[in-house]
Design a protein with these regions (language model features):
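Nucleotide-activated chemistry modules centered on ATP-dependent adenylation/adenylyltransferase
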Residues: 1-459
Length: 459
Protein backbone atom coordinates (compact mmCIF):
# COMPACT_ATOMS: atom_id res chain seq x y z
CA UNK A 1 0.00 0.00 0.00
CA UNK A 2 1.10 3.63 0.31
CA UNK A 3 1.78 4.08 4.02
CA UNK A 4 5.34 4.86 5.02
CA UNK A 5 7.11 1.47 4.81
CA UNK A 6 8.76 1.99 8.21
CA UNK A 7 5.48 2.83 9.94
CA UNK A 8 3.62 0.09 8.10
CA UNK A 9 6.14 -2.49 9.32
CA UNK A 10 5.91 -1.20 12.87
CA UNK A 11 2.11 -1.49 12.79
CA UNK A 12 2.15 -4.99 11.27
CA UNK A 13 4.64 -6.26 13.84
CA UNK A 14 2.72 -4.64 16.68
CA UNK A 15 -0.60 -6.16 15.59
CA UNK A 16 1.00 -9.58 15.24
CA UNK A 17 2.40 -9.45 18.78
CA UNK A 18 -0.94 -8.14 20.07
CA UNK A 19 -2.72 -11.19 18.65
CA UNK A 20 -0.14 -13.52 20.21
CA UNK A 21 -0.34 -11.89 23.65
CA UNK A 22 -4.16 -11.82 23.57
CA UNK A 23 -4.28 -15.55 22.83
CA UNK A 24 -1.71 -16.32 25.53
CA UNK A 25 -3.67 -14.28 28.08
CA UNK A 26 -7.05 -15.66 27.07
CA UNK A 27 -8.34 -12.21 26.15
CA UNK A 28 -11.09 -11.81 23.50
CA UNK A 29 -9.09 -9.39 21.35
CA UNK A 30 -8.77 -9.82 17.59
CA UNK A 31 -6.91 -7.32 15.39
CA UNK A 32 -8.09 -6.26 11.94
CA UNK A 33 -5.86 -4.31 9.56
CA UNK A 34 -8.21 -2.46 7.22
CA UNK A 35 -7.24 -1.84 3.61
CA UNK A 36 -9.16 -0.47 0.60
CA UNK A 37 -10.65 -2.72 -2.04
CA UNK A 38 -8.15 -3.53 -4.78
CA UNK A 39 -10.25 -1.58 -7.26
CA UNK A 40 -10.00 1.51 -5.05
CA UNK A 41 -6.33 1.73 -4.08
CA UNK A 42 -4.15 4.75 -4.71
CA UNK A 43 -2.19 3.19 -7.58
CA UNK A 44 -5.24 1.75 -9.32
CA UNK A 45 -6.79 5.21 -9.36
CA UNK A 46 -3.65 7.21 -10.19
CA UNK A 47 -1.90 4.84 -12.61
CA UNK A 48 -4.92 2.85 -13.75
CA UNK A 49 -7.69 5.38 -14.22
CA UNK A 50 -5.35 8.35 -14.42
CA UNK A 51 -6.84 10.40 -11.58
CA UNK A 52 -4.80 13.59 -11.04
CA UNK A 53 -2.69 13.43 -7.89
CA UNK A 54 -4.73 14.51 -4.83
CA UNK A 55 -4.80 18.19 -3.91
CA UNK A 56 -6.89 20.45 -1.70
CA UNK A 57 -9.69 20.89 -4.23
CA UNK A 58 -9.58 17.31 -5.48
CA UNK A 59 -9.02 15.15 -2.41
CA UNK A 60 -10.26 11.81 -3.71
CA UNK A 61 -7.81 9.69 -1.71
CA UNK A 62 -8.97 10.00 1.91
CA UNK A 63 -12.44 8.65 1.28
CA UNK A 64 -11.33 5.74 -0.87
CA UNK A 65 -8.26 4.68 1.11
CA UNK A 66 -9.41 5.30 4.67
CA UNK A 67 -13.06 6.19 5.20
CA UNK A 68 -14.67 3.56 2.98
CA UNK A 69 -12.70 0.60 4.47
CA UNK A 70 -13.50 1.77 8.01
CA UNK A 71 -17.18 2.35 7.25
CA UNK A 72 -17.45 -1.05 5.61
CA UNK A 73 -15.95 -2.76 8.66
CA UNK A 74 -18.09 -0.77 11.10
CA UNK A 75 -21.27 -1.60 9.16
CA UNK A 76 -20.37 -5.29 9.28
CA UNK A 77 -19.92 -5.12 13.06
CA UNK A 78 -23.20 -3.23 13.54
CA UNK A 79 -24.99 -5.80 11.39
CA UNK A 80 -23.56 -8.58 13.55
CA UNK A 81 -23.92 -7.01 17.02
CA UNK A 82 -26.66 -4.38 16.61
CA UNK A 83 -24.64 -1.59 18.20
CA UNK A 84 -20.95 -0.79 18.66
CA UNK A 85 -18.72 1.57 20.60
CA UNK A 86 -15.85 2.95 18.56
CA UNK A 87 -12.82 3.79 20.72
CA UNK A 88 -10.52 6.26 18.97
CA UNK A 89 -7.48 8.28 20.02
CA UNK A 90 -8.52 11.65 18.64
CA UNK A 91 -7.55 14.66 20.77
CA UNK A 92 -8.68 18.27 20.81
CA UNK A 93 -5.04 19.37 20.90
CA UNK A 94 -4.40 17.95 17.43
CA UNK A 95 -5.89 20.97 15.67
CA UNK A 96 -8.40 23.77 16.12
CA UNK A 97 -10.69 22.11 13.59
CA UNK A 98 -10.56 18.79 15.45
CA UNK A 99 -11.31 20.54 18.75
CA UNK A 100 -14.31 22.32 17.25
CA UNK A 101 -15.72 19.11 15.79
CA UNK A 102 -15.26 17.16 19.03
CA UNK A 103 -16.85 19.96 21.07
CA UNK A 104 -19.86 19.97 18.74
CA UNK A 105 -20.55 16.25 19.17
CA UNK A 106 -19.76 16.43 22.87
CA UNK A 107 -22.92 18.51 23.28
CA UNK A 108 -24.94 15.76 21.61
CA UNK A 109 -23.79 12.96 23.92
CA UNK A 110 -26.48 10.42 24.70
CA UNK A 111 -24.50 8.96 27.61
CA UNK A 112 -21.52 10.12 29.64
CA UNK A 113 -18.34 10.06 27.50
CA UNK A 114 -20.19 8.54 24.51
CA UNK A 115 -20.77 10.80 21.52
CA UNK A 116 -23.02 9.95 18.56
CA UNK A 117 -21.37 9.10 15.27
CA UNK A 118 -21.50 11.78 12.60
CA UNK A 119 -22.14 9.25 9.82
CA UNK A 120 -23.69 6.08 11.23
CA UNK A 121 -26.63 5.07 13.40
CA UNK A 122 -26.06 2.57 16.23
CA UNK A 123 -22.45 3.69 16.58
CA UNK A 124 -21.22 5.53 19.67
CA UNK A 125 -17.79 7.14 19.84
CA UNK A 126 -15.57 7.03 22.94
CA UNK A 127 -12.49 9.29 22.92
CA UNK A 128 -10.60 8.60 26.17
CA UNK A 129 -7.71 10.89 25.20
CA UNK A 130 -9.82 13.85 24.10
CA UNK A 131 -8.28 16.31 26.60
CA UNK A 132 -4.71 15.00 26.49
CA UNK A 133 -1.87 17.15 25.21
CA UNK A 134 1.04 15.83 23.13
CA UNK A 135 3.19 15.78 26.27
CA UNK A 136 0.53 13.84 28.18
CA UNK A 137 0.68 11.12 25.53
CA UNK A 138 4.46 10.77 25.58
CA UNK A 139 4.79 10.93 29.36
CA UNK A 140 2.25 8.13 29.66
CA UNK A 141 4.00 6.01 27.01
CA UNK A 142 7.38 6.45 28.69
CA UNK A 143 6.11 5.76 32.22
CA UNK A 144 3.91 2.75 31.53
CA UNK A 145 4.89 -0.45 29.81
CA UNK A 146 3.11 -1.46 26.62
CA UNK A 147 0.49 -4.08 27.68
CA UNK A 148 1.28 -6.45 24.80
CA UNK A 149 5.02 -6.15 25.23
CA UNK A 150 5.92 -3.97 22.25
CA UNK A 151 8.51 -1.24 22.79
CA UNK A 152 7.20 2.28 23.34
CA UNK A 153 10.81 3.46 23.21
CA UNK A 154 11.01 2.31 19.59
CA UNK A 155 7.92 4.37 18.87
CA UNK A 156 9.54 7.41 20.46
CA UNK A 157 12.61 6.83 18.30
CA UNK A 158 10.44 6.77 15.18
CA UNK A 159 8.85 10.11 16.04
CA UNK A 160 12.16 11.63 17.07
CA UNK A 161 13.64 10.66 13.72
CA UNK A 162 10.76 12.36 11.92
CA UNK A 163 11.41 15.77 13.49
CA UNK A 164 13.73 18.24 11.80
CA UNK A 165 16.06 18.59 14.82
CA UNK A 166 15.93 14.88 15.75
CA UNK A 167 14.72 15.80 19.24
CA UNK A 168 11.56 15.22 21.27
CA UNK A 169 11.42 17.65 24.21
CA UNK A 170 8.89 16.65 26.86
CA UNK A 171 7.49 19.32 29.21
CA UNK A 172 10.54 21.57 29.13
CA UNK A 173 9.21 24.81 27.68
CA UNK A 174 5.81 25.55 26.26
CA UNK A 175 7.30 26.97 23.08
CA UNK A 176 9.21 23.84 22.18
CA UNK A 177 7.70 21.32 19.75
CA UNK A 178 6.71 17.87 20.94
CA UNK A 179 7.19 14.56 19.16
CA UNK A 180 3.47 14.56 18.55
CA UNK A 181 3.91 17.27 15.95
CA UNK A 182 5.47 14.73 13.58
CA UNK A 183 2.88 13.43 11.15
CA UNK A 184 3.01 9.98 9.62
CA UNK A 185 0.77 9.33 6.66
CA UNK A 186 1.05 8.08 3.13
CA UNK A 187 4.48 8.45 1.55
CA UNK A 188 2.72 9.46 -1.69
CA UNK A 189 0.75 12.26 -0.02
CA UNK A 190 0.61 15.40 -2.16
CA UNK A 191 -1.73 17.34 0.12
CA UNK A 192 1.34 19.09 1.50
CA UNK A 193 4.08 20.73 -0.53
CA UNK A 194 6.84 18.76 1.20
CA UNK A 195 6.86 15.53 3.19
CA UNK A 196 8.81 16.96 6.12
CA UNK A 197 8.54 13.81 8.23
CA UNK A 198 10.13 11.58 5.60
CA UNK A 199 12.71 14.23 4.77
CA UNK A 200 13.67 14.37 8.45
CA UNK A 201 13.81 10.58 8.80
CA UNK A 202 16.21 10.37 5.86
CA UNK A 203 18.33 13.31 7.04
CA UNK A 204 18.56 12.09 10.66
CA UNK A 205 19.36 8.44 9.98
CA UNK A 206 21.75 7.16 7.32
CA UNK A 207 20.12 3.73 7.59
CA UNK A 208 16.92 5.22 6.17
CA UNK A 209 18.60 6.62 3.07
CA UNK A 210 17.00 3.78 1.10
CA UNK A 211 13.71 5.72 1.29
CA UNK A 212 15.14 8.62 -0.73
CA UNK A 213 13.85 7.23 -4.08
CA UNK A 214 10.33 7.15 -2.59
CA UNK A 215 10.54 10.81 -1.66
CA UNK A 216 11.97 11.77 -5.05
CA UNK A 217 9.29 9.78 -6.91
CA UNK A 218 6.55 11.44 -4.88
CA UNK A 219 7.99 14.85 -5.75
CA UNK A 220 8.12 13.97 -9.46
CA UNK A 221 4.53 12.84 -9.96
CA UNK A 222 3.31 15.50 -7.52
CA UNK A 223 4.92 18.33 -9.49
CA UNK A 224 2.02 20.76 -9.88
CA UNK A 225 4.01 23.07 -12.17
CA UNK A 226 4.14 20.47 -14.95
CA UNK A 227 1.00 18.54 -14.04
CA UNK A 228 -1.42 20.14 -16.51
CA UNK A 229 0.66 19.13 -19.53
CA UNK A 230 0.64 15.51 -18.41
CA UNK A 231 -3.14 15.25 -18.56
CA UNK A 232 -5.72 14.95 -21.30
CA UNK A 233 -7.59 18.13 -22.21
CA UNK A 234 -10.81 16.13 -21.83
CA UNK A 235 -12.40 15.04 -18.58
CA UNK A 236 -12.63 11.44 -17.41
CA UNK A 237 -15.80 10.76 -19.41
CA UNK A 238 -14.51 12.58 -22.49
CA UNK A 239 -16.49 15.79 -22.02
CA UNK A 240 -15.01 19.29 -22.10
CA UNK A 241 -15.05 21.83 -19.32
CA UNK A 242 -13.15 25.03 -18.82
CA UNK A 243 -13.03 28.74 -18.30
CA UNK A 244 -12.02 31.64 -20.52
CA UNK A 245 -10.20 30.13 -23.52
CA UNK A 246 -8.80 27.37 -21.31
CA UNK A 247 -9.90 23.77 -20.86
CA UNK A 248 -9.67 22.02 -17.51
CA UNK A 249 -7.47 18.98 -18.00
CA UNK A 250 -8.57 15.52 -16.88
CA UNK A 251 -6.84 12.14 -16.41
CA UNK A 252 -3.18 11.41 -17.04
CA UNK A 253 -2.10 10.47 -20.53
CA UNK A 254 -1.00 6.95 -21.43
CA UNK A 255 2.68 7.90 -21.58
CA UNK A 256 2.77 9.18 -17.99
CA UNK A 257 0.77 6.31 -16.54
CA UNK A 258 3.17 3.80 -18.09
CA UNK A 259 6.28 5.82 -17.19
CA UNK A 260 5.32 6.14 -13.54
CA UNK A 261 4.42 2.47 -13.27
CA UNK A 262 7.84 1.53 -14.59
CA UNK A 263 9.55 3.93 -12.17
CA UNK A 264 7.54 2.55 -9.24
CA UNK A 265 8.49 -1.04 -10.09
CA UNK A 266 12.15 -0.03 -10.43
CA UNK A 267 12.11 1.58 -6.98
CA UNK A 268 10.45 -1.51 -5.51
CA UNK A 269 13.06 -3.78 -7.08
CA UNK A 270 15.92 -1.59 -5.84
CA UNK A 271 14.60 -1.62 -2.26
CA UNK A 272 14.06 -5.40 -2.36
CA UNK A 273 17.61 -6.00 -3.59
CA UNK A 274 19.60 -3.24 -1.89
CA UNK A 275 17.50 -2.04 1.03
CA UNK A 276 17.38 -3.38 4.59
CA UNK A 277 16.84 -7.12 4.91
CA UNK A 278 13.46 -6.67 6.61
CA UNK A 279 12.18 -4.93 3.46
CA UNK A 280 13.41 -7.57 1.01
CA UNK A 281 9.78 -8.49 0.24
CA UNK A 282 8.32 -4.98 0.37
CA UNK A 283 5.53 -4.45 -2.16
CA UNK A 284 4.99 -0.83 -3.12
CA UNK A 285 2.34 -2.05 -5.56
CA UNK A 286 0.77 -5.50 -5.33
CA UNK A 287 0.13 -8.08 -8.03
CA UNK A 288 -3.68 -7.75 -7.59
CA UNK A 289 -3.34 -3.99 -8.13
CA UNK A 290 -1.29 -4.56 -11.28
CA UNK A 291 -3.93 -6.97 -12.59
CA UNK A 292 -6.64 -4.39 -11.95
CA UNK A 293 -4.64 -1.66 -13.70
CA UNK A 294 -4.11 -3.97 -16.67
CA UNK A 295 -7.84 -4.49 -17.07
CA UNK A 296 -8.59 -0.76 -16.84
CA UNK A 297 -6.00 0.05 -19.50
CA UNK A 298 -7.11 -2.67 -21.91
CA UNK A 299 -10.88 -2.86 -21.42
CA UNK A 300 -11.86 0.62 -20.19
CA UNK A 301 -9.31 2.76 -22.01
CA UNK A 302 -9.16 0.45 -25.08
CA UNK A 303 -5.36 0.32 -25.01
CA UNK A 304 -5.26 -3.18 -26.48
CA UNK A 305 -1.48 -2.95 -26.80
CA UNK A 306 -1.57 -4.46 -23.29
CA UNK A 307 1.68 -2.84 -22.21
CA UNK A 308 1.66 -3.71 -18.51
CA UNK A 309 3.07 -7.27 -18.75
CA UNK A 310 5.91 -5.93 -20.90
CA UNK A 311 6.70 -3.17 -18.40
CA UNK A 312 6.65 -5.68 -15.55
CA UNK A 313 8.99 -8.09 -17.33
CA UNK A 314 11.34 -5.30 -18.40
CA UNK A 315 11.84 -4.22 -14.79
CA UNK A 316 11.65 -7.50 -12.88
CA UNK A 317 12.83 -9.96 -15.52
CA UNK A 318 9.82 -12.13 -14.64
CA UNK A 319 6.68 -13.04 -16.55
CA UNK A 320 3.61 -11.25 -15.22
CA UNK A 321 1.39 -13.67 -13.30
CA UNK A 322 -2.25 -13.21 -14.34
CA UNK A 323 -3.87 -16.67 -14.66
CA UNK A 324 -7.43 -15.36 -15.09
CA UNK A 325 -6.56 -12.99 -17.93
CA UNK A 326 -8.62 -13.35 -21.09
CA UNK A 327 -7.57 -10.78 -23.65
CA UNK A 328 -8.12 -10.29 -27.34
CA UNK A 329 -6.69 -12.91 -29.67
CA UNK A 330 -7.08 -10.65 -32.70
CA UNK A 331 -5.48 -7.40 -31.53
CA UNK A 332 -2.27 -7.21 -29.53
CA UNK A 333 0.96 -5.21 -29.50
CA UNK A 334 1.91 -6.16 -33.07
CA UNK A 335 -1.42 -4.93 -34.43
CA UNK A 336 -1.18 -1.84 -32.22
CA UNK A 337 2.23 -0.92 -33.66
CA UNK A 338 1.04 -1.46 -37.24
CA UNK A 339 -2.06 0.66 -36.63
CA UNK A 340 -0.03 3.46 -35.05
CA UNK A 341 2.36 3.49 -38.01
CA UNK A 342 -0.48 3.62 -40.55
CA UNK A 343 -2.29 6.41 -38.69
CA UNK A 344 0.89 8.45 -38.29
CA UNK A 345 1.53 8.19 -42.03
CA UNK A 346 -2.02 9.35 -42.72
CA UNK A 347 -1.61 12.29 -40.36
CA UNK A 348 1.67 13.31 -41.97
CA UNK A 349 0.39 12.95 -45.53
CA UNK A 350 -3.30 13.83 -45.40
CA UNK A 351 -4.55 14.95 -41.99
CA UNK A 352 -1.98 17.36 -40.63
CA UNK A 353 -2.44 18.21 -36.95
CA UNK A 354 -5.01 15.46 -36.26
CA UNK A 355 -3.59 14.54 -32.85
CA UNK A 356 -6.66 12.57 -31.75
CA UNK A 357 -6.94 10.35 -34.82
CA UNK A 358 -4.96 7.41 -33.44
CA UNK A 359 -7.01 7.29 -30.24
CA UNK A 360 -10.24 7.43 -32.22
CA UNK A 361 -9.20 4.57 -34.50
CA UNK A 362 -7.86 2.20 -31.83
CA UNK A 363 -10.83 2.90 -29.56
CA UNK A 364 -13.38 2.21 -32.32
CA UNK A 365 -11.60 -1.00 -33.28
CA UNK A 366 -11.46 -2.22 -29.69
CA UNK A 367 -15.08 -1.35 -28.93
CA UNK A 368 -16.18 -3.35 -31.96
CA UNK A 369 -13.80 -6.19 -31.09
CA UNK A 370 -15.16 -6.44 -27.54
CA UNK A 371 -18.70 -6.79 -28.91
CA UNK A 372 -18.13 -9.56 -31.44
CA UNK A 373 -20.54 -12.02 -29.80
CA UNK A 374 -24.29 -11.43 -30.18
CA UNK A 375 -24.92 -11.14 -26.44
CA UNK A 376 -22.54 -8.16 -26.30
CA UNK A 377 -23.97 -6.21 -29.24
CA UNK A 378 -26.53 -4.35 -27.19
CA UNK A 379 -25.61 -0.68 -27.02
CA UNK A 380 -22.74 -1.02 -29.50
CA UNK A 381 -23.97 1.86 -31.67
CA UNK A 382 -24.19 4.19 -28.69
CA UNK A 383 -20.70 3.16 -27.56
CA UNK A 384 -19.25 3.90 -30.99
CA UNK A 385 -21.02 7.27 -31.15
CA UNK A 386 -19.73 8.21 -27.69
CA UNK A 387 -16.21 7.30 -28.76
CA UNK A 388 -16.43 9.56 -31.79
CA UNK A 389 -17.78 12.42 -29.67
CA UNK A 390 -14.79 12.08 -27.34
CA UNK A 391 -12.16 12.03 -30.08
CA UNK A 392 -13.41 14.00 -33.09
CA UNK A 393 -11.40 17.10 -32.15
CA UNK A 394 -8.29 17.88 -34.13
CA UNK A 395 -6.29 18.86 -31.06
CA UNK A 396 -6.67 20.85 -27.84
CA UNK A 397 -6.89 24.16 -29.68
CA UNK A 398 -9.73 22.83 -31.80
CA UNK A 399 -11.48 21.43 -28.72
CA UNK A 400 -11.15 24.74 -26.90
CA UNK A 401 -12.72 26.63 -29.79
CA UNK A 402 -15.53 24.07 -29.99
CA UNK A 403 -16.18 24.46 -26.27
CA UNK A 404 -16.24 28.26 -26.44
CA UNK A 405 -18.58 28.22 -29.44
CA UNK A 406 -20.90 25.85 -27.59
CA UNK A 407 -21.01 28.08 -24.51
CA UNK A 408 -21.77 31.15 -26.65
CA UNK A 409 -24.50 29.25 -28.50
CA UNK A 410 -26.14 28.23 -25.23
CA UNK A 411 -26.02 31.82 -24.01
CA UNK A 412 -27.57 33.13 -27.23
CA UNK A 413 -30.36 30.54 -27.02
CA UNK A 414 -31.13 31.41 -23.40
CA UNK A 415 -29.93 28.12 -21.98
CA UNK A 416 -27.85 27.42 -18.88
CA UNK A 417 -24.19 28.00 -19.61
CA UNK A 418 -20.85 28.39 -17.86
CA UNK A 419 -20.53 32.17 -17.50
CA UNK A 420 -16.93 31.86 -16.31
CA UNK A 421 -15.93 30.65 -19.77
CA UNK A 422 -16.82 34.10 -21.13
CA UNK A 423 -15.15 36.10 -18.36
CA UNK A 424 -11.64 37.12 -19.40
CA UNK A 425 -10.89 38.31 -15.86
CA UNK A 426 -11.31 34.83 -14.42
CA UNK A 427 -8.16 32.96 -13.36
CA UNK A 428 -8.79 29.35 -14.31
CA UNK A 429 -5.78 28.12 -12.30
CA UNK A 430 -7.48 29.00 -9.03
CA UNK A 431 -10.49 26.83 -9.76
CA UNK A 432 -9.14 24.20 -12.12
CA UNK A 433 -10.19 21.28 -9.98
CA UNK A 434 -13.62 22.46 -8.90
CA UNK A 435 -15.10 20.69 -11.89
CA UNK A 436 -17.12 17.77 -13.08
CA UNK A 437 -14.24 15.36 -12.53
CA UNK A 438 -14.45 15.97 -8.80
CA UNK A 439 -18.06 14.84 -8.92
CA UNK A 440 -17.06 11.89 -11.08
CA UNK A 441 -14.28 10.82 -8.72
CA UNK A 442 -16.54 11.08 -5.69
CA UNK A 443 -19.71 9.76 -7.32
CA UNK A 444 -19.21 6.18 -6.13
CA UNK A 445 -18.24 7.30 -2.63
CA UNK A 446 -19.92 5.69 0.37
CA UNK A 447 -19.64 8.78 2.54
CA UNK A 448 -23.01 10.20 3.46
CA UNK A 449 -21.99 13.74 2.65
CA UNK A 450 -21.45 12.79 -0.99
CA UNK A 451 -24.65 10.81 -1.50
CA UNK A 452 -26.62 13.86 -2.60
CA UNK A 453 -23.86 15.26 -4.81
CA UNK A 454 -25.62 15.81 -8.13
CA UNK A 455 -23.90 16.32 -11.44
CA UNK A 456 -24.59 19.56 -13.33
CA UNK A 457 -23.71 20.15 -16.95
CA UNK A 458 -22.73 23.80 -17.31
CA UNK A 459 -21.59 23.57 -20.90
Amino acid sequence: MVESPVISKWVRDSLEIMDIRAEQSGLPFVTHRLTPETDNTFWVNLLGRGYPFPRKKLRWCTDRLKIQPVNKFVKEQIAEHGEIILVIGTRKAESARRAKTMAYYEKKRVRELLSPSSTMANELVFSPLEDWTDDDVWIFLMQYRNPWGYSNTDLLTLYRGATADNECPLMVEKGLPSCGKSRFGCWVCTMVEKDKSMEAMIANDDEKAWMTPLLEFRNRFGDETNDRGRRSFRKMKGNLQGTYKQLHHGPYLKYWREKWLEELLEIQKDINENGPEEFANLELITIPELRCIRRIWVFDKHEFEDSLPGIYKKVTGKKFDDPEWVGSEAFRKEEWDILEEVVNEAVNDLYSGEEMLFEMVYSLIDIENQATSLNKRKGITESLENCIRKTFYKNEEDATQYYMDRVIRKKDLGGKYNSLALDGRYDYLNEENEDEDEKFYLKSSSRNQYNDFKEIDYA
